[in-house]
Amino acid sequence: MNAELQTQPPSTALSALSSIPAAKPRASAPETAPTSSERHHGSRVSPNGAASVSLSVAVFDSHKYDSDPLKEACAKARQNPPPDKPPVSIELRFLESNLDVHTAALAKGCEAVCVFVNDKISEQVLQELKSLGVRLVALRCAGYNNVDLQAAKRLGIAVARVPEYSPHAIAEHAVALLLALNRKLVRATQRVRDGNFLLEGLVGFDLFGKTVGVVGTGKIGATFARIMHGFGCRLLASDPVRNEALAKELGLEYCDFPVLLEQSDIVSLHLPLTPESWHLINADSIGRLKRGATLINTGRGGLIETEALIAALKSGGVGAAGLDVYEEEEGVFFADHSGTVLTDEKLAWLLMCPNVLITAHQAFLTKEALQQLAVVTVRNLRALANGEVPGQADVDGQQWLAGF
């Protein structure tokens, strides 16, 4: 879930039921479970005597690490409603299945769906959700390139996201990838476990004094830049929306993207995926990189053209690559494939490459980030229950992407 969490404009490229496959639902009742007649905005009386409302939500692609924070946030929201608002009892229907055309019917009986980065909210899915009475798509992430927003607007389905949670989580993971690659930590650990204490092949380099190119200086990019400044690095940045305060604070130099590529020893991508930023790193741009540079991507997999990266790794044009995201990660990440043969030959090659380190889209995965994601997601769900979803004219383009 590593889309850039910036509140400024996103950086560009810098210029029926029978057809559903077997699912594994994990139903979870709220702290005080509503009866069937109380669901769908049914009213009841809370312990303090105030009238309350209820809401049923289908949570797709759920896992224990995010379902527990969601349950906790729902309980707290019910116990501590705003002074002028009734308590909201949210019933969460946890589903391990991803949301797509085959599983959309699992949301029957719910007024909202809660989705993640690998769910496919296409026009066809939205039409099915509309027919089921779903009124809100609540993204528990920042990225939304998997949602057909125009279709949602036409169908009158609201879409909300979590525009920012913990920039530190993702920025720190980018630094972790860099450090592990540079000092060959994975290889060194494997050797020691095998009883091999030799040091050949483990030589790294000092980060101090190196030039680091930060592509995208929103909240995550700025946080990453501050960390690298602490290592004593020279900082270059490329972003059409310049953060002059950041530049002054860190001595960061803004420059054109080609210049950044040519001068940087390390390039770190902190961008959302847009039509303009798709394949920002391609055969042409990667050819401009300083030879042997390290490339880090915790933004979106589609920012890098995989074939171009592989060619550059083979030629030595790219010295090392740390990837928390992958262009074809859909259907691979967030699942256990350890008992099967990996059919993606490009990914298989990258995994075997000694100077490539891949993590499975986990940069966001900290306790603090998960708590913030849950709190804002529940706030968006509560807005539906309380009749506070904005109209189309009032959509802010940040937290709310489509209204009624």
Q: Where do the model's predicted regions map?
A:
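Phosphate-binding beta-alpha-beta segment of Rossmann-like dinucleotide-binding domains, i.e.
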Residues: 155-211, 223-226, 230, 396
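An N-terminal-biased, well-structured beta-alpha scaffold segment characteristic
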Residues: 2-159, 282
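Rossmann-like dinucleotide/phosphate-binding beta-alpha-beta segment
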Residues: 200-291
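Short beta->alpha connector loops at strand-helix junctions that form conserved
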Residues: 116, 140-141, 157-168, 239, ...
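Short glycine-/small-residue-rich Rossmann-like dinucleotide-binding loops
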Residues: 117-118, 265, 271-273, 299-300, ...
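A short helix->loop->beta-strand "cap" motif at the edges of active sites that frequently abuts
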Residues: 131-135, 155-157, 233, 291-293, ...
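Rossmann-like dinucleotide-binding domain for NAD(H)/NADP(H)
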Residues: 292, 299-404
